């Protein structure tokens, strides 16, 4: 979506002001600052509708309520629908060194009372009285900023109306976070990536790219088609080359004819016609499906602050599932030591290029790592110029333990010197969980000693709790002293939920 000149100019002015006040906002815990959290997934609506309970993904940024541990900070949180009071209380009770009462006085919750699939930011903009109420709570705009899932023209417009900057990237640079833009960056930096073609516009472009890939590699069995703005794998599709000969004089026609039947679309319920309409609207890429007996999908999370400083803040091994292995299910933290340090080299190269182009905020870089002949080979897959599925788990860990990730050792260390690990998932889903209210979940977790224990600094944190009763879906961050302990917390929680819901169905 192109950014209108007036909006862009105002947005850039606010971002410059942000840099001037950055030190006071982020390094003075007693500064009277305001953080406006707008957890809007401003993405393609068709893509969003394929995700079960997508509206409750707005709850993933409730981890930022931990900012209330700073006693002079005000947090304004806006959502499409009201968030149950028990969910808010659940987060506030974790605040270290702050009473729930004190925090509650500085927390302001707003709802649009709108359950449509429109962007939350659009819902806010459509309610000028709501915008006025939010603006009235921002006492010092120079010490305030907005946090979003991703930044588009809508978020830039809201930023201007609230007179506060966004800790995020100028939407004019959004192409850099698309599938095509990512490959452009990788190509310019000579970062290894799968063979493929970007900036494709339609079905014919897909056909031609599939033909060229097969001709370049006659042994290729599969290729991946990706819509530029897809997320969590739901914009992806797999093409199978079975029975197609790279030397055939009619290869292009054969692929064109077989494409509707051979293309396995990842998104639930999305047919071929809708997928191609989405591709034509947003563009995309085609690349080889990389084979390997041992494959991992690590990601590196980077941050560029308003002063232009680049940091690697975490690494994860992503857990991908679905029939095609393309759907993001969760992640383990930190990534394997065997290659986490190796990933720092291409990641910092990419982050440096992004910084030069004016990128601000957090973003993730996904890789595919293949083990061959006794070594790991890493291929850059995409840049996620937004908060992703690994953002909120890591923020939660940091808020709870006050530690830091050390890229050199590949470990996360708390102030007491101990290490922590976690397994996180946004896709814990079972029809048996439908009917469980937030109160039920928290009660079950307390009775079975699953909740995060501040003394041990281990346990389970839940998120997306609001999706549980209607969709049987929720998220978890399971923190332990080892990868094995973190995974054990996850398995125990699943077993408890399964048992409780079997013993008392529809509870």
Give the positions of each predicted feature.
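ATP-binding N-terminal substructure of ATP-dependent carboxylate-amine bond-forming enzymes
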Residues: 1-177
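Short acidic, glycine/serine/threonine-rich loops at helix termini
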Residues: 49, 89, 158-161, 234-241, ...
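Short, flexible loop/turn elements at secondary-structure junctions
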Residues: 150-151, 200, 229-231, 288-291, ...
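Active-site nucleotide/adenylate-binding loops and adjacent lid/helix of ATP-dependent enzymes
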Residues: 172-283, 333-345
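Short acidic-glycine loop/turn motifs at beta-strand connectors
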Residues: 240-244, 304-309, 371-374
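A long amphipathic alpha-helix within ATP-dependent nucleotide-binding catalytic cores
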Residues: 271-294, 312, 324-375, 414-450
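Glycine-rich phosphate/pyrophosphate-binding beta-alpha loops
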Residues: 321, 380-394
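Peripheral (often C-terminal) accessory segments that flank ATP-dependent C-N-forming ligase machineries
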Residues: 402-507
